[in-house]
């Protein structure tokens, strides 16, 4: 997955990087993941760049709603799933009905970017653009063959995400 490569590349550049692994990926539980993320709060500060993919995007937004933290440097949200998808899927419905609080999100980060593709099976183009508009974030649309921006859609090593992560 591109996240593994990004983690290794950032470590090689001697960046201070954390790549939390959340339990039970096959059957994720929002409350459990929130607890696990909260244990890392001492590492979240004004120099933090959060890069979240898919369910991680929803986790981060819920974390902000629950723990309103220090303003961070940059937030990069990649391929968020739609609420309709989350609700319709038994393994992800604990993540559904999330709140998109534009003021809270805007106040939580100096800079932000939503990255999505036009053919992500977990979120329609209309939903992604609405997501970006509600959060008042910049929006980068990847080519139509990018899918969910994961290994299944050809995203092993993804050099552009390293450039984006370092662009502060």
Language model segments and positions:
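Active-site nucleophile loop of the alpha/beta-hydrolase fold
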Residues: 22-25, 75-85
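Catalytic histidine-centered segment of alpha/beta-hydrolase-like enzymes
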Residues: 28-29, 145-158
């Amino acid at each position: 997955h591109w996240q593994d490569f990004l983690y290794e590349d950032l470590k090689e550049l001697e960046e201070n990087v954390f790549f939390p692994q959340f339990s039970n990926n096959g059957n994720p539980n929002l409350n459990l993941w929130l607890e696990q993320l909260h244990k890392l709060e001492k590492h979240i500060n004004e120099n933090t760049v959060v890069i979240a993919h898919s369910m991680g995007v929803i986790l981060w937004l819920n974390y902000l709603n629950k723990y309103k933290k220090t303003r961070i440097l940059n937030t990069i949200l990649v391929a968020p799933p739609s609420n309709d998808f989350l609700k319709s899927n038994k393994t992800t419905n604990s993540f559904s009905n999330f709140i998109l609080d534009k003021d809270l999100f805007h106040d939580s980060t100096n800079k932000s970017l939503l990255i999505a593709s036009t053919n992500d099976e977990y979120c329609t183009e209309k939903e992604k653009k609405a997501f970006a508009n509600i959060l008042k974030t910049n929006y980068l649309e990847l080519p139509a063959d990018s899918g969910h921006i994961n290994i299944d859609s050809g995203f092993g090593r993804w050099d552009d995400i390293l450039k984006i992560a370092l662009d502060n």
